[in-house]
């Protein structure tokens, strides 16, 4: 009867309100955690620059080239953190709206390699792009970001004179992208966590490279938005291999 129907509707409404409240609470927890993480990431470089500049202004230290370079490096680190956060904000705010078009991943990989040539030369690294033309329907700008971030990680954590391999090949209805390096590798216990926001396997190593541990979070979000998946194989001290599989359509 109408009474039972009304009671059922009220119960369903109550459940919906409880569910909404639970989601809002989770979002608030995420927001608080994000604010805390950002503050933590920025606090150290800001404090370093501030203390060094203060010491030079008060003539406690001479403004040597090395100290000025240190300040410059810390400012670069801050800039890298802000840049990564802005990219992640754009991705999350837009719910990843993709502007799809035919994209050749081999061409993108070659373009990324060219962009990294100065850094490769500086570290005496060899970078090879192998494979075949592989065209998918995807967002070119976002897919460029995927390859760029993976190669950036490989460059950052490779030792001098190492080799980086970018391989693209067709695999049935999919395309597989592999970025392999001979760098410092990732410990087994850290592998399941590396795609989490702000997670870094070794915080000290990022002092020179900048960034906030968001690059792989961005990569995973873009790959998933394209209906693909990403995995990694790594041995501490022996390098890493990131594998991305994307559907062609």
Model-derived features: positions:
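Short beta-strand/loop element within the Bergerat-fold HATPase_c
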Residues: 161-173
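Membrane-proximal HAMP signal-relay module
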Residues: 1-35, 53-58, 90, 106, ...
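Short alpha-helical segment of the dimerization/phosphotransfer core of two-component systems
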Residues: 73-81
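Short conserved segments within the C-terminal catalytic ATPase subdomain
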Residues: 119-129
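A conserved beta-strand-to-alpha-helix junction within the catalytic ATP-binding
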Residues: 7, 11, 99-114, 127
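Short helix-loop "hinge" at the ATP-lid/N-box region of the Bergerat-fold HATPase_c
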Residues: 154-155
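Short conserved segment of the HATPase_c
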Residues: 186-200
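Conserved micro-motifs of the catalytic ATP-binding
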Residues: 93-98, 131, 135-138
């Amino acid at each position: 009867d109408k009474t039972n129907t009304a009671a059922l509707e009220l119960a369903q409404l109550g459940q919906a309100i409880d569910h909404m409240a639970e989601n809002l609470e989770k979002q608030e927890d995420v927001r608080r955690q994000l604010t805390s993480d950002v503050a933590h990431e920025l606090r150290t470089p800001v404090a370093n620059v501030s203390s060094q500049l203060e010491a030079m202004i008060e003539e406690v230290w001479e403004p040597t080239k090395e100290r000025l370079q240190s300040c410059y490096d810390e400012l670069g680190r801050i800039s890298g953190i802000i840049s990564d956060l802005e990219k992640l904000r754009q991705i999350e705010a837009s719910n990843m709206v993709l502007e799809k078009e035919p994209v050749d991943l081999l061409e993108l990989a070659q373009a990324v390699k060219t962009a990294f040539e100065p850094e490769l030369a500086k570290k005496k690294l060899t970078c090879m792009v192998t494979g075949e033309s592989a065209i998918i329907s995807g967002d070119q700008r976002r897919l460029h970001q995927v390859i760029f971030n993976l190669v950036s990680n490989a460059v950052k954590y490779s030792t001098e004179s190492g080799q980086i391999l970018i391989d693209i090949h067709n695999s049935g209805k999919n395309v597989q992208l592999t970025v392999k390096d001979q760098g410092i590798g990732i410990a087994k216990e850290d592998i399941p966590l590396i795609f989490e926001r702000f997670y870094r396997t070794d915080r000290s190593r990022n002092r020179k490279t900048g960034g906030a541990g968001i690059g792989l979070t961005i990569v995973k979000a873009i790959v998933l938005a394209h209906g693909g998946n990403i995995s990694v194989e790594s041995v501490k001290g022996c390098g890493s291999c990131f594998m991305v599989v994307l559907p062609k359509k």
